[in-house]
């Protein structure tokens, strides 16, 4: 009835390393994007400081291999590297110790071919989300599910900021996108920053968020109390 477009986490047609230029110039944009991707993957798979630093260097090298220089904005419009480029650099560097949790994490993303490997076959996530779009991650490992959601929200937040504020008509603001995270309890306790930022700032950009879960206590998971960012509640039947 909704004519939804259903995407499986296989060759997802958006690039988490894409460079989206914000309206307010941000120096060293490739470094910011690299740091966000690195932080998210490190958080999901609990990578140590040394592992995280190694991954960050691989991401930065991937940008340079595509001719993208962090301090040269004129190069930022070149096609960005994909995760597959990063993985190839990582596996091809004999100085990097393999056989640890970092390699396992990267190999999982590579083996499942979650993201499209050719940047020419990718598009803006914000443009992709036209009509009803479902990313069906059921049946995948929990860590991989969390990683896909977190990376997608990271990219969505960056592109939301770049698009700028939505239109105002009197006191009413245009609604441009609505995000629904089903079974959100699996994700909330991880404390990913992009979700909180979208909840706090999304109104200005016409972006709404629906978090669906079975217990009220899930909204207070971890160090964050997500309930304070929610203005509308729909309660059907909860055990707590």
What are these regions (language model features)?
Residues 1-207, 220:
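P-loop NTPase motor domains
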Residues 196-240:
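Conserved ATP-driven motor cores of ASCE-family P-loop NTPases powering translocation/secretion/packaging/pilus
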């Amino acid at each position: 009835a909704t004519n939804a477009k259903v995407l499986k986490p296989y060759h997802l047609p958006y690039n988490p390393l894409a460079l989206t230029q914000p309206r307010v110039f941000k120096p060293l944009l490739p470094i910011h994007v690299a740091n966000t991707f690195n932080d998210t993957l490190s958080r999901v798979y609990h990578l140590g400081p040394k592992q995280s630093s190694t991954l960050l260097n691989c991401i930065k090298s991937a940008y340079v291999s595509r001719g993208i220089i962090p301090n040269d904005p004129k190069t930022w419009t070149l096609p960005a590297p994909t995760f597959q480029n990063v993985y190839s650099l990582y596996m091809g560097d004999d100085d990097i110790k393999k056989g640890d949790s970092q390699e396992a994490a990267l190999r999982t993303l590579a083996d499942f071919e979650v993201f499209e490997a050719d940047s020419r076959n990718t598009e803006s996530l914000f443009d992709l989300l036209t009509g009803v779009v479902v990313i069906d991650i059921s049946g995948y490992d929990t860590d991989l599910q969390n990683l896909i959601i977190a990376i997608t929200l990271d990219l969505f937040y960056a592109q939301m900021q770049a698009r700028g504020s939505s239109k105002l008509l009197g006191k009413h603001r245009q609604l441009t996108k609505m995000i629904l995270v089903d079974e959100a309890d699996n994700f909330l306790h991880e404390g990913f920053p992009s979700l909180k930022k979208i909840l706090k700032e999304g109104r200005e950009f016409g972006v709404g968020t629906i978090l669906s879960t079975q217990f009220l206590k899930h909204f207070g998971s971890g160090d964050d109390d997500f309930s304070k960012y929610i203005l509308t509640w729909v309660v059907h039947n909860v055990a707590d």
